[in-house]
């Protein structure tokens, strides 16, 4: 696997593949890779001739009091894991390469409406940072396909909307959330949890599963949410949000919606965890 922080080197290699009529899939990450990330790489490998990955801890998507400096950097281990999963090219730029004029002077991309809700409301500017870096990486790599995890459901929808609105010729693939044995969604931030907290955190997925059963049984949305919030709080979480949306439009869910998504964000101690579950009702 070739590892480079050079934009021109990435473009040169991708062009060489394209001149041979070969396809390229892209998996952007922030590093500290786990099985969930590697599943994305393997999915990318199954869909294209070549896989490009990136590792960039994007300062634009972190808020003032968030864990940018503490976010784990594990490049050597990540490189080994990416090779095993099938990546052939790894882009590891520095902030000065991505934002040479600084973030304040950087042109940005913002997807309206969806970016201001749920995670966007809790983390102002987060999705602007996500959309900007993903747009920039897409312009650098110019992939045929890009693969993302469904664990970050709102992020996935933001990216799909951006690609559609800006007429980018890229197919966006969402891959089902990979979970630990307890049901806890795999996340780089799980490393912040103690063993006891990890066991407590399994309540998130258990609660989502129970909510799905209640929705399929015809229980009212507000009642389902209210009961679930109590269960999450009783497990030691501080609720950020818990909501049910139309899985396609992201509007508030209606009983007539055939496909809904339950979304949750909650704090276990100082660690913010997110999860979601898609529920097909018809």
Swiss-Prot record:
Alphabetical keyword list: ATP-binding, Cytoplasm, Ligase, Nucleotide-binding, Pantothenate biosynthesis
Domain of life from the UniProt record: Bacteria
Biological pathway: Cofactor biosynthesis; (R)-pantothenate biosynthesis; (R)-pantothenate from (R)-pantoate and beta-alanine: step 1/1
Signal peptide (UniProt feature, chain positions): none
Top-level EC class: ligase
Subcellular location: Cytoplasm
Chief location: cytoplasm
Binding site for beta-alanine: 61
Cellular component terms per the entry's GO annotation: cytosol
Family: Belongs to the pantothenate synthetase family.
Name used for this protein in its record: Pantothenate synthetase
């Amino acid at each position: 696997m070739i590892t480079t922080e050079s934009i021109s080197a990435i473009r040169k290699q991708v062009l060489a593949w394209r001149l041979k009529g070969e396809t390229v899939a892209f998996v952007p990450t922030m590093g500290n890779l786990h099985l969930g990330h590697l599943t994305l790489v393997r999915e990318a490998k199954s869909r294209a001739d070549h896989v490009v990955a990136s590792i960039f801890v994007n300062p634009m998507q972190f808020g003032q009091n968030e864990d940018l400096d503490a976010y784990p950097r594990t490049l050597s281990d990540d490189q080994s894991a990416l090779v095993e999963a099938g990546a052939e090219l790894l882009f590891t730029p520095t902030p000065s390469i991505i934002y040479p004029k600084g973030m304040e002077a950087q042109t940005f991309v913002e997807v309206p409406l969806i970016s201001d809700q749920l995670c966007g409301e809790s983390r102002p500017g987060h999705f602007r940072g996500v959309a900007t870096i993903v747009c920039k990486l897409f312009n650098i790599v110019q992939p045929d396909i890009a693969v993302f995890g469904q664990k970050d459901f709102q992020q996935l929808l933001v990216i799909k909307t951006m690609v559609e609105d800006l007429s980018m010729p890229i197919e966006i693939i969402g891959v089902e959330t990979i979970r630990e044995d307890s049901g806890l969604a795999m996340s780089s931030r799980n490393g912040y949890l103690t063993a006891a907290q990890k066991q407590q955190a399994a309540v998130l997925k258990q609660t989502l599963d129970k909510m799905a059963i209640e929705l399929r049984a015809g229980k009212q949305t507000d009642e389902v949410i209210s009961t679930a919030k109590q269960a999450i709080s009783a497990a030691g979480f501080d609720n950020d949000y818990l909501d049910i949306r139309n899985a396609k439009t992201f509007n508030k869910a209606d009983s007539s919606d055939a496909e809904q998504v339950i979304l949750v964000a909650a704090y276990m101690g100082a660690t913010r965890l997110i999860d979601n579950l898609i529920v097909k009702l018809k």
